[in-house]
Amino acid sequence: MKPFFSIIVPCCDVAPYLRESLDSVVKQPFSNWECLLGVETSKDNTEEIAREYAAKDPRFKVFTGPRSGSCSASRNTGIDMATGEYIIFLDGDDTIVEGSLQRLHDKIAARPGADLYPCAVQVLDAKTGKITEVRDNYPADAKPEFTGPEATLFIAGIRKHPAPMMQLTVCRTAFLVEHKLKCIYGLRGQDRNFTPRALYFAKRVCPLHEPFYLYLNNRTGSVVTSIDKGVLLKDEAIIHQSLFEFHSLVSAKPSFDRRLTAIWGQSWISWIAYTWFSPMRIKRIPRARRVETLEILFKNGFTDFGPLLGGVSKSLRIAGKAMYLFARHPLLRIPVELFFRLYFLLSKIKSS
């Protein structure tokens, strides 16, 4: 029988957490699933644990690869291997809430065939052992179904910083394959690139409001906590440069909803401004590193970036042009940094 769910689990250096993660799958009363374990070269016995589960239960399948630095490669291979109707992305240090697969199945069966089923994630603080928040981009009273562009516009209207986590959404396998929705190899934070593209192509988005995923936050040694933010700048630059190119491609279509330019521009450019130029980042990340990575971001000059500025606020438009000047004109770098110190100070005063 074809699995209903394909659960894709990237595994690298997660031996202390992997048994709990896989047990949370095995113990689900709902049993029609396969679990694809993407094991990258690890410094611990992650692979041994993964193969132990595969030896005991044929629903677990192990594939291996070299150490890549992120979940992207394992997720991409998992999508290619998946035989289930729907895909769930689960990290090897996180768990699935008890009994939630059956609830997900029942809710999906009531509205079958959607491309994306956004759910909710419970955030567990690794240091305190307490659930600190539940992330759900859609309020309980949201309408039951959107198109992808409608969902993008709706979320932008109610959330300044929606959660882009891939784990938040159950995806129809055929939809991901049809639109070649993959992660960029080796990059951290790939959710930020995947989510807007998936929403753009989705014809049906059905929020389920099911808090099925338990996300372990602040874990020592995780990719998020163990890498200096200056190192992550290169990944952020590649991700956003890819998004700029994506916007240029799809915005040329006659059917493109021009409101998406404003939404994407506001979101992406404000994130870039904060990531490269907030006072804390200016202090902690060397100027040379910020210049180097902005050159990646603006590798096509103003061609892909400029059109996004048209729909953003006046202050953000000025900030966007300042970022470009910082990357291209060495003599303006100190003045631009001074501008951003004032920019973020005024933003803080305005929001207080």
Task: Describe these PLM feature segments.
Residues P3-S6, E34, N193:
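Cell-envelope/extracellular polymer assembly enzymes that use nucleotide-activated donors
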Residues D13-K27:
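Short, well-formed alpha-helical segments that are part of the catalytic scaffolds
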Residues S31, V39-I49, R67-S68:
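A conserved acidic beta->alpha catalytic loop
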Residues G65-A82:
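Glycine-rich, basic loop-to-helix element that forms the pyrophosphate-binding segment
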Residues I87:
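Short aromatic/hydrophobic "clamp" motif used to bind/position activated sugar donors
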Residues G92-L208, Y213-V231:
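Donor-binding/catalytic cores of nucleotide-activated saccharide
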Residues E210-R219, T225-P254, W271-T303:
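Catalytic core of nucleotide-sugar-dependent glycosyltransferases
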Residues S278-S352:
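Membrane-interface aromatic/basic loop that binds lipid-linked glycans or pyrophosphate carriers
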